[in-house]
Regions:
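Cofactor-binding active-site loop characterized by glycine-rich and histidine/acidic residues
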Residues: 26-33, 37-169, 190-193, 199-203, ...
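Cofactor-/ligand-binding subdomain signature composed of acidic, glycine-rich
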Residues: 1-40, 61, 284-295, 317
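Short acidic (Asp/Glu) and glycine-rich catalytic loops that position anionic groups and cofactors
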Residues: 32-34, 62-67, 176-179, 209-216, ...
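Structured core elements
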Residues: 43, 66, 174-176, 220, ...
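Ligand/cofactor pocket segment of small-molecule handling proteins
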Residues: 162, 168-173, 178-242
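Glycine/aspartate-rich loop-and-adjacent alpha/beta segment that forms the canonical ThDP
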Residues: 2-3, 239-335
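Conserved thiamine diphosphate
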Residues: 135-141, 199-235, 278-304
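Hydrophobic alpha-helical scaffolding
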Residues: 7-8, 17, 41-45, 76, ...
Length: 335
């Protein structure tokens, strides 16, 4: 992939990305702690915050996003309000979709988030259409589409269909595979061949190799390194804007919690989980900023407390939001 990345982010931007990751973590851990049925079926992406923040922060307001059932990180990185997100999960009227979507079907038009899809690979079926509309003149000139999906979706036929269309029609589409090593309750190693030797040590690369087979420029990135993700995403977005063609990023990360909440992860090898824990993206980013003296330990504690306070206020907002009126049950239902 040619390098069109802007210079390294300003220290203030690095701190901002760390704070965004902390807010995402605090938000999802609070949701996970809520007793069912208060937040039923919540799917978290704890451990994958660098992938969300690194890519979304590389996009522009004119761009469009399609994502999946682990969507909170992408939404919060894009600027979504935690209170409205929690209200949506709780089925309250102040949620972004008036309490109808939960975390699995949410759409936030004002942020350019077209949809989240609970259907594995569902976002891949629609992303080429959004990018085609942009190419045909809909929306602002130079805008691109980013679609987030997991390694499970890469095992669906729509993965190849979407890439084939994007390459053939030269669509302004950024494919972002968050390879978190798990497909619901099944380990990735049980569903696809071994990774290429060049990227095996990183823990990924097979999915990017599939994409490259279609003639798509690809990159395999340490998805727990927010700086590396951000740089790769900026380069990919700049390349798309420059030549109009698609790009592909495989972000190698790890799902630290279960498939959904509650899930005791009894199927996960404790030794494997222990190997990934030291690679936690928030801890790594924080330590780097401390080592480089960009931030002091006291400031780091302040960021954590501010994230927790924001989520506490968000939960209170959601709890105080009214329930929808029964008379509106069929509103906004078109099929």
């Amino acid at each position: 992939m040619p390098s069109h990345a802007d210079p390294s982010p300003h220290p203030a931007e690095l701190v901002s990305m760390l704070e965004s990751m902390m807010l995402i973590r605090a938000h999802e851990e609070r949701l996970a702690s809520l007793a069912s049925p208060t937040a039923p079926g919540t799917c978290t992406a704890v451990g994958q915050e660098a992938a969300a923040v690194g890519v979304v922060r590389a996009l522009e307001p004119r761009d469009r996003i399609l994502t999946n059932h682990r969507s909170a990180g992408h939404l919060i990185a894009r600027g979504a309000d935690c209170g409205r997100l929690i209200a949506e999960v709780m089925g309250r009227v102040d949620g972004y979709c008036k309490g109808r979507s939960g975390t699995l079907h949410i759409s936030v038009a004002e942020l350019g988030v077209v949809l989240t899809s609970t259907i594995v690979g569902g976002e891949l079926s629609l992303a080429p259409g959004v990018a085609l509309a942009q190419k045909m003149g809909q929306g602002e000139a130079g805008a691109i589409t980013a679609v987030f999906f997991g390694d499970g979706a890469a095992c669906e036929g729509i993965f190849h269909e979407a890439i084939n269309l994007a390459v053939t029609w030269r669509l302004p589409l950024l494919f972002v595979c968050e390879n978190n090593q798990w497909q619901a309750y099944v380990a990735r190693r049980e569903t696809m061949p071994a990774d290429p030797a060049a990227t095996a040590a990183l823990g990924g690369g097979r999915i990017a190799a599939w994409a490259a087979g279609h003639g798509l420029p690809t990159a395999v990135i340490d998805g727990n390194d927010v700086d590396a993700v951000h740089a790769a995403a900026r380069a990919a977005a700049a390349s798309i804007r420059a030549d109009g063609g698609p790009r592909f990023l495989e972000l190698v990360t790890y799902r630290q919690r279960g498939h959904f909440e509650p899930d005791d992860q009894a199927y996960v090898d404790p030794a494997e989980l222990a190997r990934w824990k030291p690679l936690d993206p928030i801890a790594r980013a924080a330590q780097r900023l401390l080592d480089e003296k960009v931030i002091a330990s006291g400031e780091l504690s302040h960021l954590r407390e501010r994230a927790r306070a924001t989520v506490a206020a968000a939960l209170k907002f959601a709890e105080n939001s009214p329930w929808p009126d029964a008379s509106e049950l069929a509103n906004d239902v078109y099929a």
